[in-house]
Design a protein with these regions (language model features):
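N-terminal secretory signal peptides and thylakoid transit peptides that target proteins
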Residues: 1-21
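Long, aromatic- and glycine/proline-rich binding clefts that accommodate carbohydrate-like moieties
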Residues: 149, 153, 306, 358-410, ...
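A structural signal for short loop-to-beta-strand junctions that line the ligand-binding cleft
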Residues: 101, 109-113, 139-179, 315-318, ...
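Extracytoplasmic/periplasmic substrate-recognition and gating elements
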Residues: 76-77, 100, 182, 254, ...
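Hinge/lid segment of periplasmic solute-binding proteins
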Residues: 35-45, 117-169, 221-224, 304-306, ...
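Glycine-centered hinge/linker elements that transmit conformational signals in sensory
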Residues: 198-203, 239-267
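Extracytoplasmic "Venus flytrap"/periplasmic binding protein-like
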Residues: 73-146, 181-183, 283-284, 294, ...
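Short, solvent-exposed loop/beta-turn-alpha elements that line the ligand-binding surface or hinge
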Residues: 43-46, 133-146, 210-216, 232-252, ...
Length: 447
């Protein structure tokens, strides 16, 4: 069944109050319908910044130390404001759950919160976050200095709803020592077909358990498998037509299953493939750019990074973006919002985005960030920066259907850990995704 709905029309209807539960990108808590975003322009003239604010973070890319350092430097520069760093979860889903709980209780909200690049729109629909435009103007934030594709992710209806923070793409990580021992070139494979030819050589010449480790499914499947799907001309969806059961999509996922069972050169991580790779369990993996610094610190071998491989149908523009931004909740006082904006401005200054990138591997979000010293120390970060030019917008089915990410992960688990029939599993997933559309999206659009 084709879900015939233009993406732009969908978003315009949603923006008029079509319903907050209509849109979701990562897996996570369901969201009650809110009052919607306020159309009243915010005015902070005469507002004094709060003396203390809470900053909720899940410390993406193991960034707690660099976050503490930025807070200390901000407080030294602004002695009248104290920033309390709160660990609000171990990942984007957990921090979203905590934020939704605080919203429901109408208490305990932070002044600044880390939000997934695809969670912000749900918060926008619920009226949970404020537009930043008046604060951007008042504080003279140089919005045009942000990397366009990253900052534009948070623009809607002519307003800016968040600023980019820990932004990432998946990268292909490989063990240079293993590749050399197997007589392979020192680069990422151009396609998954090429890596399938390399994999037996890696297994034969190294002590690694696997040539490749698939990322953990619960947190990554819906995101990273888009790469496999796109390379074969498949997708989770095209616009609003669910296409996960197409011949191309099935072929892509069949190849992934074959790597685990038929050809037996790949494993599936139970928790974090970056850690498995750094420990030497596999010769290669796919993981976020935010895993880069951790891998480089932990690995006892020479680490290589490259663009994600293409497939038989597409060899470029097969990489999705991801990561997190920072938003300011609507349910806190104007004084807290102003103080949060001042800290947000500080965190996103060029030198601080460079420092954050150096500490984590995430992409610097400012064009003017001086990355010379960072790249001299960690040249691998440039690969992530370069890959940004060939990324692709995520599929609508993952980005806007509530609960779709979990369903994709469940389907991937059946295929990659239970050897379920791929076509049958994708047919079932299609029915589930169409059900989500008909139940949670279509009724809202008629409202």
């Amino acid at each position: 069944m084709k879900l015939a709905l233009d993406r732009r029309l969908f978003l315009s209807l949603a923006g008029m109050g079509a319903g907050a539960a209509a849109l979701s990108a990562c897996g996570g808590p369901s969201t009650a319908v809110g009052t919607g975003p306020s159309e009243t322009a915010l005015n902070f003239d005469g507002v004094t910044p709060a003396a203390s604010i809470d900053f909720w973070s899940n410390h993406p890319g193991k960034s707690q130390d660099v976050e503490k350092d930025m807070i200390a430097r901000f407080e030294a520069k602004n002695p009248g404001i104290k920033v309390n760093l709160v660990t609000a979860g171990a990942n984007y889903e957990e921090i979203a759950q905590k934020f939704q709980t605080a919203q429901a209780a109408k208490s305990g909200l932070p002044a600044l919160v880390v939000l997934s690049d695809v969670w912000w729109f749900r918060y926008y629909l619920n009226g949970n976050i404020i537009p930043l435009d008046s604060l951007i103007s008042q504080l003279d934030v140089k919005l045009d200095d942000f990397r366009t594709s990253l900052v534009d992710d948070y623009k809607y209806d002519g307003q800016q709803w968040a600023l980019p923070y820990g932004r990432s793409t998946p990268l292909f990580y490989y063990n240079k020592d293993h590749f050399a021992a197997a007589g392979l070139p020192d680069r990422a494979p151009a396609t998954w077909q090429e890596f399938a030819e390399w994999a037996p050589k890696l297994k034969a010449t190294t002590r690694a358990q696997y040539a490749f480790m698939h990322p953990a499914l619960a947190g990554y499947a819906g995101w990273t498998l888009q790469n496999n799907l796109w390379g074969e001309g498949g997708s989770w969806s095209r616009d609003w037509e669910v296409t996960c059961d197409s011949a191309e999509s099935v072929a892509a996922l069949q190849a992934a299953q074959d790597s685990v069972y038929k050809d037996a050169w790949a494993g599936v991580s139970s928790k974090e493939s970056a850690d498995d790779f750094a420990a030497g369990l596999a010769s290669a993996t796919v993981s976020s750019t935010g895993s880069l610094i951790g891998i480089l610190k932990s690995a006892t071998f020479n680490v290589g990074v490259g663009f994600l491989p293409g497939g038989s149908k597409a060899k470029t523009e097969v990489c999705p973006t991801g990561g997190a931004g920072l938003g300011i909740p609507s349910g806190v006082t104007p004084e807290e919002q102003l103080a949060a904006a001042m800290f947000l401005q500080f965190v996103t200054e060029p030198e601080n985005t460079a420092a954050f990138s150096a500490a984590t591997g995430y992409m610097p979000t400012r064009k003017s960030a001086d990355m010379t010293a960072v790249l001299a120390k960690t040249p691998q970060i440039k690969t992530a920066m370069d890959q940004l030019a060939v990324t692709r917008v995520q599929d609508n089915a993952r980005a806007f259907l509530p609960g779709a990410d979990q369903e994709m992960a469940k389907a991937a688990a059946k295929i990659l850990t239970q050897e379920a029939d791929v076509k049958t599993t994708m047919t079932e997933l299609k029915a589930t995704l169409e059900g989500l559309y008909n139940t949670d999206v279509k009724p809202k659009l008629k409202a």
